[in-house]
From Swiss-Prot:
Keywords: Amino-acid biosynthesis, Cytoplasm, Dioxygenase, Iron, Metal-binding, Methionine biosynthesis, Nickel, Nucleus, Oxidoreductase. Catalyzes 2 different reactions between oxygen and the acireductone 1,2-dihydroxy-3-keto-5-methylthiopentene (DHK-MTPene) depending upon the metal bound in the active site. Fe-containing acireductone dioxygenase (Fe-ARD) produces formate and 2-keto-4-methylthiobutyrate (KMTB), the alpha-ketoacid precursor of methionine in the methionine recycle pathway. Ni-containing acireductone dioxygenase (Ni-ARD) produces methylthiopropionate, carbon monoxide and formate, and does not lie on the methionine recycle pathway. GO terms for molecular function: acireductone dioxygenase (Ni2+-requiring) activity; acireductone dioxygenase [iron(II)-requiring] activity; iron ion binding; nickel cation binding. The keyword Nucleus applies. This is Acireductone dioxygenase 3. PANTHER family: ACIREDUCTONE DIOXYGENASE. Fe(2+) binds at residues 96, 98, 102, 141. It is found in: Cytoplasm; Nucleus. Its main location: cytoplasm. The keyword Acetylation does not apply. It catalyses: 1,2-dihydroxy-5-(methylsulfanyl)pent-1-en-3-one + O2 = 4-methylsulfanyl-2-oxobutanoate + formate + 2 H(+); 1,2-dihydroxy-5-(methylsulfanyl)pent-1-en-3-one + O2 = 3-(methylsulfanyl)propanoate + CO + formate + 2 H(+). The lineage of its organism: Eukaryota, Viridiplantae, Streptophyta, Embryophyta, Bryophyta. It comes from Physcomitrium patens (Spreading-leaved earth moss). Pfam families: ARD (PF03079).
Length: 203
């Protein structure tokens, strides 16, 4: 009996400042990886599921029931399959927030979700087949395909599907303020406390 090949866990890293092709990885030199724990602290949820059997997968059913994801649809993101591809890809890569969670389950292909950390630096999240990711409401983010130019995803919603992007700046939006208070402010407060402690030690 052969050994089962394990798929890699979802990867994330800090992006460089290069303006080259958005489909490239954009690693810093040297690379700076970000843990799943760090992503969770920013409110980003992740599961690895059985994409080949999504219609009958009990784990997916459990997640949907627990989190109230009652509506689904599907999207193929590729030059061949997506109408108005160039326009939509450009819109996907505009930094924005939503007033609801963004839930995406990658059924095939791969792509990048970029999110901001508490210091406003970009973190690039690389999703593959089987990755299900949830970005919280109010989180600045954007999406890009990678060099494979293909991703098929299930989109999930709580109730009526709403996909209204609010492009940055949206810092006065109530949902953005709530996200800052829940996920960013605790990190910034810790940073301020750490800096104050360091300054006190040098006095």
């Amino acid at each position: 009996m052969g050994l089962e090949v394990q798929r890699p866990l979802m990867e994330a890293w800090y992006m460089d400042d290069s303006a080259e092709d958005q489909r490239m990885p954009h690693h810093r030199n040297p690379p700076e990886y970000v843990s799943l724990k760090k992503l969770a602290e920013l409110g980003i949820l992740h599961w690895v599921l059985d994409a080949d059997n999504y219609e009958t997968d009990p784990d997916l059913k459990h997640i949907r029931k627990e989190r109230g994801y009652s509506y689904e649809d599907f999207v193929d993101v590729s030059p061949e399959a997506l109408p108005n591809y160039e326009t939509k890809i450009k819109n996907f890569y505009e930094e924005h927030i939503h007033t609801d969670e963004e839930i995406r389950y990658c059924l095939d292909g791969s792509g990048y979700f970029d999110v901001r950390d508490p210091e406003d630096r970009w973190i690039r999240i690389w999703v593959h087949k089987g990755d299900m990711i949830v970005l919280p409401a109010g989180c600045y983010h954007r999406f890009s395909l990678d060099a494979n130019n293909y991703l098929k995803a299930m989109r999930l919603f709580v109730g009526e599907p709403i996909w209204t992007p609010y492009n940055r700046p949206q810092d006065e939006h109530p949902v953005r303020k709530e996200y800052i208070n829940l996920f960013l402010k605790p990190h910034l407060d810790k940073s301020d406390l750490s800096l104050a402690t360091q300054n006190a030690e040098t006095v």
